[in-house]
């Protein structure tokens, strides 16, 4: 476990007593995959993003004494749960950030509600965080499986990909992504021919890809992420699947995945994202600073950690407290204009509503540099991208 203190400095004998009396101690825990298939899309980059948010918020000058912890949940719910309990019970953590891997995130959401903390989830995709397992202490940033499906799934089906076969990671996120994309495909007039589920994480996709190939579907939908998606695409190319006429749909695809594959292999793939480093001046400026520290451009998960941390600290400052439900209620009190996500708001169920974007990976000829990888094809309004709120999760009712 790593610990970083970004707190109040000694300001002299006269200033220090007043500062000590007024300062609010805030402990943030960045909980994610630091060594496995999701390490590139979250990992240390999310710690850096949280640190940048604390610095850019100027927390010290505003009387917030912020400490950042980080740990590797290894994509295992039991490991993530144990860390979360230890953080809340022994380390005084006020909010847990990032938490990719939906099975881990759902477990941590329950513990957070029990302990009165805040979960600012930027990494997980399951819609259950704001539906079946919603809590007044959960805020779901960045994306979810419904938004991914409404972007990539709809675009590919309407472009002629009428029949689908899913290759799905066998855990909560994969199941949710397959389910939401199936709905969108069928609503658009397409048909799902079948699915096969692979262990999470996996390295050998040969038998699963052969089943998908044998289905004869127009589109093989990859309902997985990170290293699993990269490996599946590489192996599909080796088997000649796309060369034979079937298309791949990478339903959750990150800039780090495209970079790992290279434009030659990934060109033409469509993807849905909440953020791209080159989308506007503000994104470019922040991403350049991030790259100086991390050595790569940020993913939308990294951007989400930064944005969520900024909004959380603003809420703590506004109410002068780190009490979980009170902070989240303050975050829901008014819309925000975020430098990375634009205009948005935290809905009563904890779902953050902001625009999503459909991108297509550029060809090597179209790309002007190492990270010049996306061309924007469409904007999906936040109100259309995410599922409507269900009554059971409307925490504005008290």
State where each predicted segment sits.
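N-terminal signal peptide c-region/cleavage motif recognized by signal peptidases
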Residues: 15-17
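Extracytosolic ligand-binding ectodomains
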Residues: 4-8, 20-398
């Amino acid at each position: 476990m790593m610990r970083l203190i970004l707190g109040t400095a000694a300001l002299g004998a006269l200033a220090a007593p007043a500062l000590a009396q007024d300062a609010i101690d805030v402990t943030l825990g960045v909980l994610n995959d630091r060594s496995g298939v999701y390490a590139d899309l979250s990992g240390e980059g999310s710690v850096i993003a949280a640190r940048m948010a604390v610095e850019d918020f100027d927390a010290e000058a505003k009387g917030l004494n912020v400490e950042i912890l980080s740990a590797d949940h290894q994509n295992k719910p039991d490991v993530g749960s144990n860390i979360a309990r230890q953080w809340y019970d022994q380390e005084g953590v006020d909010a847990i950030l990032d938490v990719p891997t939906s099975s881990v995130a759902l477990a941590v959401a329950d513990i957070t509600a029990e302990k009165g903390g805040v979960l600012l989830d930027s990494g997980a995709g399951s819609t259950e965080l704001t539906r079946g397992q919603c809590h007044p202490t959960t805020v779901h940033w960045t994306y979810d499986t419904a938004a991914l499906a409404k972007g990539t799934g709809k675009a590919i089906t309407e472009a002629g990909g009428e029949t689908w076969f899913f290759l799905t990671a066998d855990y909560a996120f994969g199941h949710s992504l397959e389910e939401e994309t199936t709905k969108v495909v069928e609503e658009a007039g397409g048909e799902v021919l079948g699915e096969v589920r692979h262990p999470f994480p996996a390295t050998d996709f040969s038998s699963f890809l052969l089943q998908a190939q044998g289905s004869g579907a127009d589109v093989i939908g990859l309902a997985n992420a990170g290293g699993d998606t990269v490996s599946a695409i590489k192996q599909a190319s080796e088997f000649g699947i796309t060369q034979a006429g079937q298309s791949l749909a990478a339903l959750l695809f990150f800039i780090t995945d495209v970079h790992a594959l290279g434009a030659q292999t990934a060109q033409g793939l469509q993807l849905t994202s909440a953020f791209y480093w080159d989308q506007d001046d503000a994104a470019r400026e922040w991403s350049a600073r991030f790259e100086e520290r991390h050595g790569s451009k940020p993913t939308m998960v990294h951007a989400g950690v930064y944005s969520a941390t900024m909004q959380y600290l603003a809420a703590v400052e506004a109410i002068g407290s780190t009490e979980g439900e009170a902070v989240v209620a303050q975050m829901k009190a008014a819309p925000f204009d975020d430098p990375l996500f634009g205009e948005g708001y935290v809905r009563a169920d904890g779902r953050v509503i902001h625009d999503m974007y459909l991108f297509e990976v550029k060809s090597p000829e179209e790309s002007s540099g190492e990270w010049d990888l996306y061309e924007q094809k469409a904007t999906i309004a936040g109100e259309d991208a995410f599922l409507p709120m269900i009554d059971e999760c409307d925490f504005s009712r008290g």
